[in-house]
Structures are given as C-alpha cells and as structure tokens.
C-alpha cells in the first residue's frame, strides 16, 4: 500500500491585495494546482498560507503562479519564521493595478487621474444638450472619451491582461463589459459615470481596507524590534532573532522586553497588557522570569535569555493570531464558495436578459434589454462579502487578542457563539490553586512534625500544587538521597521510600486500593492521607481559595444565556459541594480520575451538535478533556507553552471572567458578519430584481455596489475596537 507524503505548510507575504477579487483570485488559482490541498489568504495582513504536497508541486511553482497573477511576494515578517536567514522574493509585473506594499496605498496619487476625469465629465455633461445632434458633438466626444479612459484605464488594462490569462469574471472584466456595452448603445455619459463611480468606490475601498489592516496590525504591535545585547563589556542594538540562549540583554525603562528570560539584575515594574490585555503593573526582581512583549516601566533590567525569539511567548502569541485565519468558519467557507459561483451565474443571467426577451417578446427594444443586462453585470461582483467577512473575523480575533484572549480561528469564534454549557475544572481555574496547609491530624502515635516531614519528602519530586504547599509548610531543604523509588499514581497520590520507610500519600481511593484503614474526613478542604509501612499515620488538611471574579464569571455567563455551568474535580464531594454553592454553579461531579472527566464531558455534549460545550481548564493536566470539548479553553496561557498548544481558546490570565468576555467578542463578531451578509445580499437581490424589470439605472447599480462594499468593510472594522 502506498503512503501519501506528508503535507507541507508554507507562509508568504503577498503585496497588492487591496482589490476586492484578489483573495479569491489567489486562492482559486493556487487550489487548481495539482498537489495544493488548501490556500488561505488573510486580507487584513497580506498573509498567504499554502498547504501542499511537495512531491506533486514545488514551492517555486507556487511562487511562479502568484507572480503570474501580478503580485509581489516575500517571506512574511513573522515572529516565528525569521529564525535564521530570509529568502526574499521579488516577483514583479509591470502595470499591475494595485499598490504592492502589503497595504500601503497612496490615495492622493491614485485620485489625480480620477479627479481630472471628473472635471472632463462635468464639462461634457454641461455641453451635452447644446451640442447634441449638431456638428459640435465631436467636441463632446473629444472630452468624454478622455474622461472614460482616464477613469477606466487601469480597469481596462487589468481586464485585458486577465482575459489573456484566462481569468475572467472579476470586477475589472465586469465593469469593462458593462461600460463598453453602454458605449455600444450610445449611453456615453452613463458609461463614463459608471466607470467613475466604480473607480472612486474602489479607491475608497482600497483605502478602507488598508486603514482597517493597519488598525488590526496595531493590535499586534507587541513585537519587539530590537534587543540591547551585552557582550564583552559593551551594549549594542541587534535584532531579537539574532540573540542566543544564555546571552545577556539590557532592558531600559520604557522599552519592550525582547525575549523570554531570567532577571539577573535590577528591580522594576512591568506592564503585561500586550500579553494579558490588563494594564495592571507587576513587580519583577532578580530570579523572576520575564517574558517578551512586557514593557519595562521603571528600573534597568539585566536579563539572561532562556528562549530563542522564535520560541518566546510573544512570538507564539503573534503567530497564533496572524495564522488564525487558516481555520475558517463555515460562514467564511460558504461565502468563498458562494462568490466563486455567484458571479458566473449573474453573468449568464445577464446574457439571457440581453438575448432572450427580444427573441420572444414582440416589439421588445433590444437596446433596452441590453441596458438591463448591463445593470445586472454591474451588480454581479460580490466585493463587499469577499473582503468584509474575513476582515470581520480577523478583527474579532485581533480585538480579543488585545484583551488577552487568543482565539485560534474563526471556526472557534462561531462555536463560542453557540456555547450553552460551560464546564470548569476546579483547581487553578475557579480556585486560586495556591494551597496552604491548615491542619495536620495525627494517628497511631505519629507526631505532627514527623507526619509533615514524611509527607514533604515523599512529595519532593511532585510538581502538583498540593505537593508544593506541603513542602512550603515543611520549609526545609530536602536532599535527593533522602527519597528513593518515587512513583506517581495518577488521580490517587504518590508512593516513595523515605528513610527506609514506604510512605503512601494521597486520597481516600489510594488508601482503599492499598487496603489501609483510615479516617473518613467530613471536612471542607483537600485531604492528603498518609500511611507509613502500611500503618495509617493521619492526614494533612489543605485549603484552597476561590478566585475573586469566579462568582461574577458565573453570573455573566448566566446573563448571556449559558444554560448550564458545571464543575469537574478530583476533590472530595464535600469540597466540591462547598465550592459549587459559593460560586453558584448548576452542577458538579467530584472524586473523578483524569480519564473519567472525558466520560463526563461526553455525557454533557449535545448529540445534535447545535448547542456547544466549552471546557475551561489549565491546558496542561486537562489536555484530553480540552480536546474532547466543542471548544477547549485554557487559562493561564502567560508563559505556558502547553496551554497555547493544547486549546482552541487561550486566556492569557487566570481570570475565569475572561470566558464570558470571549463569548461576548464572538457574538459581537457574528452579529456584524451576519449584518454584512444580509446587507450585501439584500442590496444585490434588490438591484437584480430592479435591473431585470428595468427600474434601475447603471448609475444606481454601481453606486449600490461600491456603496454596500464600503459599508460592509467599515462595519467589519468596528469589531476590533
């Protein structure tokens, strides 16, 4: 059996994607190449992501196809792809109709020929009546034809080039046919007016897209540009990508921290808002970990770099946001497919309107039906939808990132809008996870000191918060030689040999399994039972605190229409009930093993798939549950690679109230996307009907077409604010 070769994903920066059909043109052209599985263009950043089989199609072939379409190409200035060397590409084609600066657009320069055309057109209109059907009519033509060429030269040239390439059914082709058709039926003023309206509208569309692109990119400006590298007693400014692990860097007040590292010298206040969305400053000191993207506010910091820039927290965050568009929502996929078929269908409908009625309706005026067909051609470009829908989703993702919420794709934005059940893990999610030993209860002759010592040493290799709290209460150093045969028993506890004694520390289930008689503790807190050489030694009571915003988080979710809030925990029934009652949860399930949480999630899932379930955990211990939920949400992503890798949505802080905020952003995005779809399709349907029955003019049609595109784009940019 032959095995398929692994697919490769390549990212490229494409210049000149300010036109309404560029996205469809590039995606469609690349996906027709044999071996290309998917091509996805992000209009907002000019980023192209191509997934392909390198055995069937080469990267060179893909680059040549993009260059043949008339776009410039370079490797993206990505936070994670600049590790090492760059391979800039400069594929140019003279005469491409759009600016090639990945969003750079000179409106003043583009407006000059259009304004000249408007002046000439105005003169032609003023003298149209006096000169009509007179020898002086040639003067009218001498003014109006240059006006047509000035306003439409770019459109005509692009349409001609695209026809030679076999690329028809874009807006340039449609406007060329519509205006040449108007000229053919002696509608000169209308032909010029349509081209002028279209060109002015297109210019403002390009300007609006460029502006929204810049506003969205501004959300992602946390990327540090330089690093102050300390080497051989000197400090020099270098690119963060060139700094190596264990290098020393200096961060001055007001500067962004360029790389993740450990503070060796200096104390300061840092602003973490670029990562968390919250501008509350935190204090850092020698020994603390500091992350790229934070802003140093006061002291001078000397930092030892612990990660390359490509592996830093901010690089992963930026890459996640920039690449979120590759995971498209069903709405976005539908619009892309719809746009590919809609334009050809309307073109053929236009042909039918122009040709059939004069053949079958006695006395039908051929020029009148041709005019109606031209109106349909003008309205047949789905520009507003093609740009505004992806722009809306990207704005939602960028706006959420500004508030410390990372959403990995528009498909998860859509899923969040339908969430009706939210399931929380307890420890570290609803509670602080900062455990403290509150009581040591001894049995069978053990002292408190002896029990705490044995427990701390037995737990010395564990990273669980409960183990950390026991070691913190013991407050003495523990040598590795004091502990042997350490074994972690998932969902139960640990076993280790301490001072030649077999120590078991864990929950009720562990002692039941070992058939050791022990107390049944009816207390609100986490109980760690201890047994030494099979003899019960007592238990340690550990308390956890509920997070300050946990109660408000549940209230917000209820207010938003979430029908059920549930907590899953491995803790005892008593502890779970106490937390659930204090917070106001609808239900809880206690004493669960990690694998049992997945079973509980499956029981809560909606069989129809319409009502979505979100699970909120720490992204590390809850990976299987996060993967099984409709929407997996990981909290505390700040500095946690595992959380960023695992979940569909990452909350950079530990605040459960961010869950409601994420759902709010998703619903706002969805609302604006639906508004744009209804607006664009409604206007187009209206003018198709009016055009067919002869109640719409070319002027009105082009005004409606470019107007609705502008409105949809401007509406989409509201999401990011």
Curated annotation (Swiss-Prot):
Binding-site list for Mg(2+): 618, 622
Cytoplasmic side: 1-107, 161-167, 211-344, 388-671, 718-721
EC code(s) of this entry: 7.2.2.12
Keywords, in A-Z order: ATP-binding, Cell membrane, Ion transport, Magnesium, Membrane, Metal-binding, Nucleotide-binding, Phosphoprotein, Translocase, Transmembrane, Transmembrane helix, Transport, Zinc, Zinc transport
Cellular component terms per the entry's GO annotation: membrane; plasma membrane
Catalytic activity: Zn(2+)(in) + ATP + H2O = Zn(2+)(out) + ADP + phosphate + H(+)
One of the GO biological process terms: metal ion transport
Binding site for Zn(2+): 19, 22
Enzyme class, first EC level, given as a word: translocase
Gene3D superfamilies: 3.30.70.100, Calcium-transporting ATPase, cytoplasmic domain N, Calcium-transporting ATPase, cytoplasmic transduction domain A, HAD superfamily/HAD-like
Family matches, as SUPFAM superfamilies: Calcium ATPase, transduction domain A, Calcium ATPase, transmembrane domain M, HAD-like, HMA, heavy metal-associated domain
Region (Disordered): 80-101
Membrane protein topology class: Multi-pass membrane protein
Active-site residues from the entry: 425
Domain HMA: 8-74
Gene Ontology terms, MF aspect: ATP binding; ATP hydrolysis activity; cadmium ion transmembrane transporter activity; metal ion binding; P-type zinc transporter activity
Annotated compartments: Cell membrane
Membrane topology, Extracellular segments: 129-140, 188-190, 364-369, 694-701
Ranges that cross the membrane: 108-128, 141-160, 168-187, 191-210, 345-363, 370-387, 672-693, 702-717
PANTHER family referenced in this protein's UniProt entry, alphabetically: CADMIUM/ZINC-TRANSPORTING ATPASE HMA2-RELATED (PTHR48085), CADMIUM_ZINC-TRANSPORTING ATPASE HMA4-RELATED (PTHR48085:SF5)
Protein family membership: Belongs to the cation transport ATPase (P-type) (TC 3.A.3) family. Type IB subfamily.
Protein name (record): Zinc-transporting ATPase
Organism: Synechocystis sp. (strain ATCC 27184 / PCC 6803 / Kazusa)
Lineage of the species this protein comes from: Bacteria, Bacillati, Cyanobacteriota, Cyanophyceae, Synechococcales
Gene: ziaA
């Amino acid at each position: 059996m032959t095995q398929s070769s692994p697919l490769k994903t390549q990212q490229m920066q494409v210049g000149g994607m300010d036109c309404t059909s560029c996205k469809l043109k590039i995606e469609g052209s690349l996906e027709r190449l044999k071996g290309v599985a998917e091509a996805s263009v992000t209009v907002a950043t000019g980023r192209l992501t191509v997934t392909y089989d390198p055995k069937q199609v080469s990267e060179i072939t893909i680059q040549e196809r993009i260059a043949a379409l008339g776009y410039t190409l370079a490797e993206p200035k990505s936070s994670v792809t600049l590790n090492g060397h760059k391979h800039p590409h400069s594929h140019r084609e003279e005469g491409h109709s759009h600016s090639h600066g990945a969003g750079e657009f000179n409106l003043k320069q583009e407006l000059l020929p259009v304004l000249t055309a408007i002046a000439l057109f105005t003169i032609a209109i003023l003298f149209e009546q006096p000169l009509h059907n007179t020898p002086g009519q040639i003067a009218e033509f001498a003014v109006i034809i240059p006006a047509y060429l000035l306003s439409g030269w770019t459109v005509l040239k692009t349409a001609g080039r695209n026809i030679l390439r076999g690329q028809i059914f874009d807006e340039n082709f449609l406007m060329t046919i519509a205006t040449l058709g108007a000229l053919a039926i002696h509608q000169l003023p209308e032909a010029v007016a349509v081209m002028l309206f279209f060109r002015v509208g297109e210019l403002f569309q390009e300007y609006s897209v460029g502006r929204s692109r810049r506003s969205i990119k501004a959300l992602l400006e946390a990327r540090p540009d330089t690093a102050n590298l300390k080497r051989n007693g000197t400090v020099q400014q270098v690119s963060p990508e060139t700094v190596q692990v264990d290098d020393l860097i200096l961060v001055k007040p007001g500067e962004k921290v360029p790389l993740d590292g450990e503070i060796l010298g200096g104390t300061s206040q840092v602003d973490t808002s670029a990562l968390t969305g919250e501008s509350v400053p935190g204090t850092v000191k020698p020994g603390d970990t500091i992350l790229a993207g934070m802003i140093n506010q006061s002291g001078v910091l000397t930092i030892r770099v612990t990660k390359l820039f490509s592996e830093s927290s901010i690089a992963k965050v930026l890459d996640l946001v920039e690449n979120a568009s590759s995971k498209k929502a069903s709405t976005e996929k539908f619009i892309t497919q719809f746009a590919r078929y809609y334009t050809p269908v309307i073109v053929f409908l236009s042909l039918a309107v122009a040709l059939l009625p004069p053949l079958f309706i006695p006395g039908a005026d051929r020029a009148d039906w041709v005019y109606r067909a031209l109106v349909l051609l003008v309205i047949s470009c789905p520009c507003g939808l093609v740009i505004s829908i992806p722009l809306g989703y990207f704005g939602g993702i960028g706006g959420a990132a500004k508030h410390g919420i990372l959403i990995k794709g528009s498909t998860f934005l859509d899923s969040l809008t339908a969430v009706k059940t939210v399931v929380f893990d307890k420890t570290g999610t609803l509670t602080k996870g900062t455990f403290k030993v509150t009581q040591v209860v001894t049995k069978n002759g053990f002292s408190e000191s002896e029990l705490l010592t044995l427990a701390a040493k037995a737990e010395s290799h564990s990273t669980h918060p409960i183990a950390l709290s026991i070691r913190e209460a013991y407050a003495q150093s523990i040598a590795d030689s004091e502990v042997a045969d350490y074994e972690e028993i998932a969902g139960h506890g640990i076993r280790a040999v301490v001072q030649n004694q077999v120590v078991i520390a864990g929950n009720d289930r562990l002692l039941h399994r070992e058939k050791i008689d022990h107390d049944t503790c009816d207390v609100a807190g986490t109980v760690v039972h201890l047994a030494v050489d099979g003899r019960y030694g007592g238990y340690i009571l550990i308390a956890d605190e509920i997070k300050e915003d946990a109660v408000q988080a549940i209230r917000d979710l209820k207010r938003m229409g979430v029908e059920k809030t549930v907590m899953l925990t491995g803790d005892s029934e008593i502890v779970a009930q106490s937390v659930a009652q204090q917070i106001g949860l609808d239900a809880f399930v206690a004493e669960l093993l990690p694998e049992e949480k997945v079973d509980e999630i499956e029981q809560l899932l909606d069989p129809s798939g319409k009502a979505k379930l979100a699970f909120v955990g720490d992204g590390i211990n809850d990976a299987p549950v996060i993967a099984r939920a409709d929407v997996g949400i990981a909290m505390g992503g700040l500095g946690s690679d595992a959380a960023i890798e695992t979940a569909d949505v990452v909350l950079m802080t530990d605040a459960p109230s961010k869950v409601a905020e994420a759902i709010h952003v998703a619903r706002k995005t969805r609302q604006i996307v639906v508004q744009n779809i209804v607006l664009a399709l409604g206007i187009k349907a209206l003018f198709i009907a009016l055009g067919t029955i002869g109640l719409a003019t070319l002027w009105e049609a082009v005004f409606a077409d470019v107007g609705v595109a502008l409105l949809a784009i401007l509406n989409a940019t509201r999401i990011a604010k």
